[in-house]
């Protein structure tokens, strides 16, 4: 009998609840934490959107498209009904981060900026950066097409020179792609993983990115490998996660791309159809800010 991939996530949560080290953290909430975890999710004919609770699929999709656009303005995402970056872009949060001179919503040179304009001088979220810095994402796609056996198929959001200007340094900071047998796989290194809220989102987001890059390069999705550094459960998520652990995984949904897309910048939210997603009910959890 094949074990459902979702059990890897659930088993990590169990391990943290049973044996995690009690640690303080930036938010003041406190965590239980373990260091070093790996899980592998097959993308063949399925999409790893967790089923033991409902995951906000539209939020996953819109956030990734926002990254791909190179945007650093949380207001742009919020206007699409996705509020997941609102707290980190608030006037109060920016002031506490030493960035009180910024307009609310200006997150600094975070994920999308590093993916599309690595090395450019950051001014603000309204500036047009076209032609500035290294477009890692476009270069990555081109290299997969030209040299699929390359060991340099890397995309990074971690730029030490820019960290002080970011509202929040990247948690999911580096991924590497790998081509074999006509399939594209992706391995993500995540320095900090919030098991209750963030990690289910991150699994889906990088799996979606793998589907998109595979589509553009004429490959099939293979595996998503997720490596976590500090894997933690916030103390106010312990009881909600205990509820989640009582539930059995259901079949993963399938993801279809509905039209032929030729350029990474041409993807739209309506290009994706998630089919057969029948999860357990949502479990409310407060985000630690």
From Swiss-Prot:
This is Thymidylate synthase. DUMP binds at residues 26, 151-152, 191-194, 202, 232-234. The keyword Secreted does not apply. It catalyses: dUMP + (6R)-5,10-methylene-5,6,7,8-tetrahydrofolate = 7,8-dihydrofolate + dTMP. Belongs to the thymidylate synthase family. SUPFAM superfamilies: Thymidylate synthase/dCMP hydroxymethylase (SSF55831). It comes from Equine herpesvirus 2 (strain 86/87) (EHV-2). GO terms for molecular function: thymidylate synthase activity. The active site is at residue 171. Pathway: Pyrimidine metabolism; dTTP biosynthesis. Keywords: Methyltransferase, Nucleotide biosynthesis, Transferase. Gene3D superfamilies: Thymidylate synthase/dCMP hydroxymethylase domain (3.30.572.10). Its EC number is 2.1.1.45. One of its GO terms (biological process) is dTMP biosynthetic process. (6R)-5,10-methylene-5,6,7,8-tetrahydrofolate binds at residues 194, 288. Pfam families: Thymidylat_synt (PF00303).
């Amino acid at each position: 009998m094949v074990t459902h991939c979702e059990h890897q996530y659930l088993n990590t949560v169990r391990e943290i609840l049973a044996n995690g080290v009690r640690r303080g953290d930036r938010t003041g909430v406190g965590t239980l934490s373990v260091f070093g975890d790996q899980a592998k999710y097959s993308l063949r004919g399925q999409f790893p959107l967790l089923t033991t609770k409902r995951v906000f699929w539209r939020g996953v999709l819109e956030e990734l498209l926002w990254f791909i656009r190179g945007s650093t303005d949380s207001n742009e995402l919020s206007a699409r009904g996705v509020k997941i970056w609102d707290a980190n872009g608030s006037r109060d949060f920016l002031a506490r981060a030493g960035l009180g001179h910024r307009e609310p919503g200006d997150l600094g040179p975070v994920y999308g900026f590093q993916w599309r304009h690595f090395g450019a001088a950051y001014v603000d979220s309204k500036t047009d950066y076209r032609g500035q810095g290294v477009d890692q994402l476009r270069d990555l796609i081109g290299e997969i097409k030209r040299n699929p056996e390359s060991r340099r198929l890397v995309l990074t959001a971690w730029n030490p020179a820019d960290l002080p200007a970011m509202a929040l340094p990247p948690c999911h900071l580096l991924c590497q792609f790998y081509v074999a047998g006509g399939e594209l796989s992706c391995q993500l290194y995540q320095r900090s993983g919030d098991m209750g809220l963030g990690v289910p989102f991150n699994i889906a987001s990088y799996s979606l990115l793998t589907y998109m890059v595979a589509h553009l390069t004429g490959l099939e999705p293979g595996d998503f490998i997720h490596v976590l550094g500090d894997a933690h459960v916030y103390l106010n998520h312990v009881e909600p996660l205990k509820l989640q652990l009582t539930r059995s995984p259901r079949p993963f949904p399938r993801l279809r791309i509905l039209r032929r897309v030729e350029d990474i910048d041409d993807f739209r939210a309506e290009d994706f159809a998630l089919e057969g997603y029948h999860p357990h009910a949502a479990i409310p959890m407060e985000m630690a800010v």
